[in-house]
Amino acid sequence: MMDKKCTLCFLFLLLLNMALIAAESEEGANQTDLGVTRNKIMTAQYECYQKIMQDPIQQGEGLYCNRTWDGWLCWNDVAAGTESMQYCPDYFQDFDPSEKVTKICDQDGNWFRHPDSNRTWTNYTLCNNSTHEKVKTALNLFYLTIIGHGLSIASLIISLIIFFYFKSLSCQRITLHKNLFFSFVCNSIVTIIHLTAVANNQALVATNPVSCKVSQFIHLYLMGCNYFWMLCEGIYLHTLIVVAVFAEKQHLMWYYFLGWGFPLLPACIHAIARSLYYNDNCWISSDTHLLYIIHGPICAALLVNLFFLLNIVRVLITKLKVTHQAESNLYMKAVRATLILVPLLGIEFVLFPWRPEGKVAEEVYDYVMHILMHYQGLLVSTIFCFFNGEVQAILRRNWNQYKIQFGNGFSHSDALRSASYTVSTISDVQGYSHDCPTEHLNGKSIQDIENVALKPEKMYDLVM
């Protein structure tokens, strides 16, 4: 019941945010990109003229070129025979701000004039020299991101349908899976909205509406939820195996608080700090250390989770080596999936600060980071659902029943149903042990359950 209420609440918030962003986008569409660029240039021109008037007059000996405004950038006094240099402006989308602009002061103390026009000239050619390649790479990364989140949403929704439809899958660990999957679905939806409606809408970013900041706040909050629900998975397994030694039930209320409630704290602190100390338009810039308010707790959650999982493996290998050997093997299967996911979901925070230098290295880095960041939902659903032995057994059983019911040319249908029941029962027992071992054993050993499961098969042999 709580899952359904949380789902409806989050979907309502997402739809409301989408409507606000769409309304702001239509309202700001009248202000064209050209108008935004013109405002930037006029602001830079005003600041340049103020600087020209306020800076002290050049007192040094020798010839020099006077300070000037060339129409796009402001230039200081430069000694004759030198070349002045600064970064390209960000007025235009096809300009690369990491490239350089040059302006030459000749030996006579005059700014260089272009021979074709006989007018003072600044070399902006490098600003869009490699624009075509960079735009192509940016588009590839954009489509890679959208496809990744689209596949993640599709796979996660299919997984949630499977978990909700098959009641035999209901257990506490599957409940944690459902919440983890739902957090990834919400995060992917918000990311797609942010990339399509905010990040690529220069007019909307220029107007700086509240809705785009709300979108960024929700995005950062849901990103935190992803990692803290992964922490919940690790804590659950650690409590089940190490602390309570295969306890039957745990109170999930604390997991809901940690997974959905705690990420609100860093998200709110970041929003307050951002509005006070780095209140850029739509909070879209990543060039601020305030993002450590979000990334710090996430890294801490990953480290704690990794510690829990390694401790679980230690216990399963040592303490349960002699006793509960069969159970320890089954628990190891459940731990293995989480142990694989934690490094994969956390590697982006290890690689993020170490951006390599060089054109090819940077491009490879961008592709790897985008795959690691935007295909997480697909990875989570694949490991926790599609590779889950219990899910595979349930789907296999229903597929076999479907073939028996609707297939043609089968004889002895009653016997085949009995055989299908026998196979599915064995598969279900083995599959249940993968994710919910203690909740399905009910105090019996593995051998006892296998003996019960084999009884229909023996009866089938007698009938045949």
Curated annotation (Swiss-Prot):
Residues carrying sugar: N30, N66, N118, N123, N128, N129
Phosphoserine modification, residue list: S420, S445
Site entry: Required for RAMP3 interaction: Q250
One GO BP: cell surface receptor signaling pathway
Protein keywords: Cell membrane, Disulfide bond, G-protein coupled receptor, Glycoprotein, Membrane, Phosphoprotein, Receptor, Signal, Transducer, Transmembrane, Transmembrane helix
Gene Ontology cellular-component annotations: adrenomedullin receptor complex; CGRP receptor complex; cytoplasm; endoplasmic reticulum; endosome; lysosome; neuronal dense core vesicle; plasma membrane
Transmembrane domains' residue ranges: 140-164, 176-198, 210-238, 253-273, 290-314, 330-351, 367-387
InterPro entries for this protein: GPCR_2, GPCR_2-like_7TM, GPCR_2_calcitonin_rcpt_fam, GPCR_2_CGRP1_rcpt, GPCR_2_extracell_dom_sf, GPCR_2_extracellular_dom, GPCR_2_secretin-like, GPCR_2_secretin-like_CS
Signal peptide: 1-23
Topology, Extracellular side: 24-139, 199-209, 274-289, 352-366
Annotated site (Required for ADM interaction): Q202, M373
Family: Belongs to the G-protein coupled receptor 2 family.
Protein name: Calcitonin gene-related peptide type 1 receptor
Protein's organism: Rattus norvegicus
Gene field: Calcrl
